[in-house]
């Protein structure tokens, strides 16, 4: 018969199975409908016993089957709340109900399918219970931690096979039953959740890189990151990693189930995010992390979206007036000045709308390009006056290579007279500020249309087209802001060379960026125009003369005659960029997208004769592809839709606030609707991105004193294994050194030096150097100062004052050497005392302790110091100085070396703690070390724990020292 207190697996199974059988028999003995309360209590007990039986059976299967157990990798798809300890009991109870003919509520079809499997599970489990009961009666070893079964017995082999069958059936039933009860992810959904985890991890790494979050927050598992990371992941998934798991262009059923309910609002958020410039996006991300107030005028700071530095800004009005000196018409000059000032003050909302209208007009005019070629320069010239249309291909992603992107070289609003020439790369993403400032130029041109003629517009049109092609290192014919922000983007052309000319920035353009941050940008509209211009550009358009790509045209240059404007352009180039330009035609490029390095340096704004350009333009426009009009219609529709969405907001602050509310709302809904999945993802993200755990530093038992104190090593270093004295919380004052002391001693003309190792006797090797130096030009009776050059970890809390100023003699030095030898003998006695701690003989320990304490180096050193003071007192001159010195405390005996009290020899237990004496370093119990006294010689002015013997001795020695000091003070005052 099995004992109730037997802890072996078979015995535990026997008692649990017997209790389960008793409860089941009681349930079958009465009608549950007549006594519902009793039935409820018994059912609860039944399920508890089922859990216990299955838990023990699972342990037996783990030991017997081992690796032959059926895999349960499908549990990774289960919700977190399903994986509980009593899951096995619930499955057994459900299998019995299904086998008895019951059905799961609202799951009749699934119940019918699972009923045969449930019957097989209950039958297999009953067979396993019978076989295990037999083994309990045959092969049980009381209190055995392992099973002791007879492997040659047929019943053991039968038990092994029955357990394998039950394990397979139970795993299959677990998957079917849980899938019928709760929603279980499919393979695709599980993979999408893993991709969401990757997105969260990439988002966190990006936030750490640009300074939105700190690594300390990740290491500390800051709860605020549970809200910040999902919010930032939505922004990054829609804009930065637009082709990732939050790609809204894919069908809705392919999205992760976490974001599938929010697909509509996520599309709207994406459209608004694409209209943000670099600073606005950074402010939004910062707002999502910190909930700070929106301030679009603050510089970006440390962000992957690099902002132009403040020193690049210049005054556009001053720059524009410098080139007005060469204008051939006063009216043209005033128009140029108005253009620049309007760039600063005109609102960007109306300009954005007019830009879209220009795109629509251009689409309509493309159909009539053959019949009316004279109207095309005006329309296209107005459309081309936006640098973002031609410069978006120069943008890079936050994770792109650090090679500086070429600066756009066709800003019509700024002038060629730049105050500074910057070599910093331009801002990433899209240049919304440049778009705004050039939209203002369009308005000015509309107000004064008579100031420019057709020839100037025709010439400027082709020059701007060539400038866009040559100044752009990336040629992206059909793109959007999403794939512009893809990480690790490589140039799409094989002629991309980051030359020094490509790095020159435009001060005028960057100055407008700082002044127009509040104006809404129209990135989508500008992108549409970029695609349109690249489709309309043909190979013959690259026949134009080439110039520096960083030269920026002023608005007044469009209003001048070709000859006058050409002269001013050359003069501005020579003045600000210090380059020489030839006014001859360059060779024609065989392919428009394969410009050489030298050609890219010379392309694209130098003027040519309008008579030569006009026939080529007519030929190019006549041979345009008819498909450009249809594709342009789609691009313009997209641009108008995105721009119209932004125009609904009064200011940038309103737009950012609306985005914050929407993004935070979606992210917070994930906390409620998908709490389990979000917890799993965040747990994985934290584990992947936390700092590497520091390797455990194994602290050796024998800590070298060189790691703790600065001392001069010698053969007299003692008790290295007992360096635990500096680990005490009671001796915090002891291990923190104070300032070193300087001993003064008089000397004659004879230069003598002697190292006095008095500190070695204190087991901390406080080495004191006493060097007698002669005083130059002083009489024989003059005093010289002997400095203490090396006192290791000296304590000077200043309770003992030692007057040690006297003339040294050869006899005194000999006396010190004798004292040193005597102290070394005392050290050996102290070492023997420490080695005899574990002695079981109280008499020997006490005798050793008493003898060592009487011959303590402390008292020896104190006596030597008193003898030195008494000897020096008779020869002390009137000019003697007094300093103080304290000793190092003795080393503590490690706890492991002291199993018993060193006084009463009582063994230490968990309740009888060890206590160290601060005076001798010994280990005592609380009774033998219940005394306390100050130890001024160690710098301990407050009362600390000491043993009884040290207390009696220190009190007596303290009284003696005080008497000697009082006598010395009286003598000093009398002298």
UniProtKB/Swiss-Prot annotation:
Residues 299-458, 504-523, 556-633, 740-891 are annotated as: Disordered. Keywords: Metal-binding, Phosphoprotein, Zinc, Zinc-finger. A zinc finger (FYVE-type) spans 895-955. Pfam families: FYVE (PF01363). Zn(2+) 1 binds at residues 901, 904, 925, 928. Residues 430-458 have a biased composition (Acidic residues). PANTHER family: LATERAL SIGNALING TARGET PROTEIN 2 HOMOLOG. This is Lateral signaling target protein 2 homolog. It comes from Drosophila sechellia. The lineage of its organism: Eukaryota, Metazoa, Ecdysozoa, Arthropoda, Hexapoda.
